[in-house]
Amino acid sequence: MNLKYKLSPQIKCYDAIGESFTPYLMRKDNAHKEFPSVTTNKYGFRNTIDHNGNIIDFDKVFSEKGNNFGIILGSSAVFGTGASNDRNSIPSQLSKITKLPWLNFGCRAYNSTQEMINLSLHLRNRPKDIVVFSGVNNLTLAHLCQQTSEIYNSFFGESEIRSAINSKRYSKDVSLSWMMIQITKMFLMKVGLIHNSRDAEVRKNIADDYNKILECFERDLFSLKAIAQGHESSLTFFMQPLATWLNKTLSSEENQLFEYLDDLNPSFRVLAEFLGDWKENYFSDIENICVKLGIPFFNLNSSTFESSDWLFVDRVHMTDEGYKRSARFIAHSLDL
């Protein structure tokens, strides 16, 4: 049996969600999906469970007067990949702690630009708090993609879309379907369900693109702050925890899973080493951007996550306990 599924059987549900082409955002998790471990609403967002155990209705929250709710913006960690059920995502845990609605605006594999656009497209009321729980994907996607734009960033599936448009195979009849097939293949390789003969290759050195990554981050946070100020909402940035960035004693489960994933797809190990090399500069630069923009910055790569407890199902995504600790960290930092 797949060791990942043996130790974390809920991952099967996440791998089955799928994705669809979405205007402006390129792609998004499929809507109206219902599995034992994860469900999505009509917008493709994961359902948040309130403190009474009920699903929070996004439309109802947006239609009510006042701003007594929060939004968590990010990618797969906010989505809650790895959690055993909807109750254990960060937004659900915050809803339990605060007894107020926290909406899950996490979409898997998004960069900071997509996160900002995602909020712009779906925000229809004034939240009290906007939390950005992010940081890993801008760096990761720059490593995986052929190039990084100081305007458009690097996005998941970019190389496949670029190849499709530039290919002789491109035509009005097949371009979109072919692109989606390639993006799906890339996603399956990412989660380890299929292999790529080039997996062990180091895609590129991002030194030349590093400033572009930071430019996109600063632009996106600037835009998010403008949105927050316009709605009289607080905005806070939390650097998400990454096993590679922590001085963590790995649990036996983490050791098994990381070794299994590295053997299954050698590029995981290469990526982990790459992210580790940029750790100190990246933390400092993102914090400096937040200080420049007047956005509170917190880093979860701290002693909170350095115990030998099982906190990660892979180097990015967490267990129920990992997400609970993240929610408590956020609640404590914001004095919720």
Feature map (PLM): residue ranges:
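Serine-dependent acyl-ester chemistry module
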Residues: 137-284, 308
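Residue-level recognition of beta-strand->loop/alpha-helix junctions
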Residues: 104-108, 239, 299-301
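Serine-esterase "nucleophile elbow" of acetyl-processing enzymes
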Residues: 43-108, 113-127, 131, 323
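Solvent-exposed loop/turn segments at secondary-structure junctions
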Residues: 77-79, 108-112, 136-140, 242-245, ...
